[in-house]
């Protein structure tokens, strides 16, 4: 399909072309298509910029008529020039609330359906700003406000520099009528309230440019964090011996490096839901040792929790009977 050379669609195409050149030089991609403006504009651009683009449409089956919406989105993808379009029905179950469960089901379906292709997601600069703001509100360290990466294999995000208004305008230029998901305007979801209440207020009070500033902040922190991660990886190779950490040797490292080493080590040992409070408590075993007891870090088994202990100058991870808590 030939696309009109209008400003918005050209901006989207440029972003997709740049992403493919950087991350998918063979030109084969999958696109996650919901039928909304962001993913529609992305699909239209990918269909002409990629060597081969396939559309994956996840039907969460949470609303009446969702199958018709999914089928319509798939048909539109074929019209736009995608090599194929597949509807992936999912069951949304699990803990953490509807948003989290739907996200998990969606990503699992996309991963199963993509084959060997990277999956392009329609996250925009506005989504990036919301993500950074959410991370900031949690106060769990610099990593939480990095925002989303342009490529976190297999997930690609070509539109992180494109405003949501541009994708909507691109759909208008293409004569496409995006599907409006009721969940995207429901105040029951924190991200929706950020989008419709908090960010507009910040833009008004601070005189505009807030979304772009938040996105740039996340990008800068992500770049700086990558350097610290590399330093921490070198340090980890030196201080971890037979699965245990030499506390005195790690204590010589700067605090951000120490915590990165500990985070990597704990995750490799099976820690789950690791938060800033837990990480700092483990860091205290290294840098502020005064004979304190073990630190629970999340994870383990139904009968035993995962804990970190310091013994004879080394940190080790073990299990502790939950019934003794």
Swiss-Prot record:
CDD domains: TilS_N (cd01992). It is found in: Cytoplasm. It is an enzyme of class 6 (ligase). InterPro entries: Rossmann-like_a/b/a_fold, TilS/TtcA_N, tRNA_Ile_lys_synt, tRNA_Ile_lys_synt_N, tRNA_Ile_lys_synt_subst-bd. GO terms for cellular component: cytoplasm. It catalyses: cytidine(34) in tRNA(Ile2) + L-lysine + ATP = lysidine(34) in tRNA(Ile2) + AMP + diphosphate + H(+). Its EC number is 6.3.4.19. Keywords: ATP-binding, Cytoplasm, Ligase, Nucleotide-binding, tRNA processing. It holds the Pfam family TilS. One of its GO terms (biological process) is tRNA modification. GO terms for molecular function: ATP binding; tRNA(Ile)-lysidine synthase activity. It comes from the Bacteria. ATP binds at residues 34-39. Its main location: cytoplasm. Ligates lysine onto the cytidine present at position 34 of the AUA codon-specific tRNA(Ile) that contains the anticodon CAU, in an ATP-dependent manner. Cytidine is converted to lysidine, thus changing the amino acid specificity of the tRNA from methionine to isoleucine. Belongs to the tRNA(Ile)-lysidine synthase family. PANTHER family: TRNA(ILE)-LYSIDINE SYNTHASE-RELATED. The N-terminal region contains the highly conserved SGGXDS motif, predicted to be a P-loop motif involved in ATP binding. HAMAP family: tRNA_Ile_lys_synt (MF_01161). This is tRNA(Ile)-lysidine synthase. The lineage of its organism: Bacteria, Bacillati, Actinomycetota, Actinomycetes, Mycobacteriales. The gene is tilS.
